[in-house]
């Protein structure tokens, strides 16, 4: 991959949602909501602070996250694959 996030940004690969309902019915692609879970594939160096240091990033490459899929999330295709670019503040939780 040839994309590198800056500051407090993350590059995330969206994880697929299961296409079956709780009752076992197979759902069409129009019926399936986009997943708000993803795998972090790249992490920026952290937000620059006034004193010249950088804020420590809590999210690491390889983490599985739950994120807020809202206004600030950008989608970018790299080498034919779709990635999300989001801020660390858009991360709601790390799945352990």
From Swiss-Prot:
Q: Which UniProt keywords apply?
A: Chaperone, Cytoplasm
- Record localization: Cytoplasm
Q: Tell me which Pfam families the record gives.
A: Cpn10
Which InterPro entries does the record associate with it? Chaperonin_GroES, Chaperonin_GroES_sf, Chaprnonin_Cpn10_CS, GroES-like_sf
According to the lineage, what is the superkingdom?
Answer: Bacteria
* Family matches, as SMART domains: Cpn10
Protein's name according to its UniProt entry: Co-chaperonin GroES 2
- Species name: Vibrio cholerae serotype O1 (strain ATCC 39315 / El Tor Inaba N16961)
- The gene behind this protein is groES2
